[in-house]
Amino acid sequence: MAEEAVDARGEGARFIEKVKSICGNTSRILYKYDEPTDPRYGYLPHERPLDVYLRYGMIVVDKPPGPTSHEVVAWIKRMLGVSRAGHGGTLDPKVTGVLPVALERMTRIIGTVMHSSKEYVCVMQLHRPVEEDRLREVLKLFEGEIYQKPPLRSSVKRALRTRRVFRIELLEYTGKYALLRVDCEAGTYMRKLCWDIGLVLGVGAHMRELRRIRTGPFSEDSGLMVRLDDVAYAVIRWREEGKDDLLRRVVIPGEYSVCHIPKVLVRDSAVESLTHGAQLAAPGVAAVEEGVEKGGMVALMTLKGELIGLGKALASAQEMLEAERGIVVSPTRIIMERGLYPRMWKRQQAPQGA
């Protein structure tokens, strides 16, 4: 009995909507072609065989105090037996919180998708108490574009640079201690920010404690974050009992990392050509998220919800829906392996010899 085609607006579409909901993305998916996707090719992301699932997986770790970010990644590599893993933004040893760890194929885009805003909760200790109104007044001065020079103990060159602080909220203030919530651009040094605030106040200050509560699309209240002992227990259960249910909970499909990036859904017939370096032409577009803008980054996805890679949109969402020919997306980073979908383009025959 032949396998039935999967409705393009069925399981794959539901998975994409679930991915979008992680970061509150409510943009609509606008369909150009209402066609099915062939179940013989590719996988629904949550139904991949375990070895494939791990190759395209991520773990959102609640980093404990003590180990470095690199040590956390090394432990996860050893536990899972994967060859490659990488994290989405370094946390100092004493700092806790959200640390996304990409596995295997997902390491190709982790730096790109995580290089966005980050959010922290910070305990700042003033060296002398000040009036709360004065503190709030100075905190406002540090919203917007600020100048920073990396600390002495830093892995990057100590050159003056600008960073954007989107919001600083004073949550509590008691005696010399201020609890702050800071939403800022990636690469902002919180320790230096506290020191500069103390300098402007005229009393001095330093960072006492720090926790990252969001990086890119992942936050501590998303329901995706796990502890290292959760990972260890899931691996033991898998290796000793052959049960992978817990492992599939702690490792999530890497597609969640692009929940905030506008999406272009690709027809089955165009997927394999993208993995071979081709650009995406208008006839290969099945659907477009309404937030796609010309010149912006897009996530290329199959109708099953698999991430093919990232690209630069050469047309707006409406233009992609209306176009019948021409290149509409130029891929910048492909993560999907070759051979999951059929070759649908014609091979160019070599000219006959004279």
UniProtKB/Swiss-Prot annotation:
What reaction(s) does this enzyme catalyze? uridine(55) in tRNA = pseudouridine(55) in tRNA
Record keywords: tRNA processing included? yes
Q: What residues does the PUA domain cover? A: 261-336
Entry-linked SMART domains: DKCLD, PUA
Q: Report the InterPro entries cross-referenced here.
A: Dyskerin-like, PsdUridine_synth_cat_dom_sf, PsdUridine_synth_N, PUA, PUA-like_sf, PUA_sf, tRNA_PsdUridine_synth_B_fam, TruB_arch
**Lineage: superkingdom:** Archaea
GO MF terms here are: RNA binding; tRNA pseudouridine(55) synthase activity
- Keyword terms, alphabetized: Isomerase, tRNA processing
Looking up Gene3D superfamilies in the UniProt record yields: Pseudouridine synthase (3.30.2350.10), PUA domain (2.30.130.10)
Positions the record marks as coiled coil are none
Record-stated family: Belongs to the pseudouridine synthase TruB family. Type 2 subfamily.
Concerning HAMAP family, the annotation shows: TruB_arch (MF_01081)
Function per UniProt: Could be responsible for synthesis of pseudouridine from uracil-55 in the psi GC loop of transfer RNAs.
Q: What is this protein called?
A: Probable tRNA pseudouridine synthase B
What is the organism field in this record?
Aeropyrum pernix (strain ATCC 700893 / DSM 11879 / JCM 9820 / NBRC 100138 / K1)
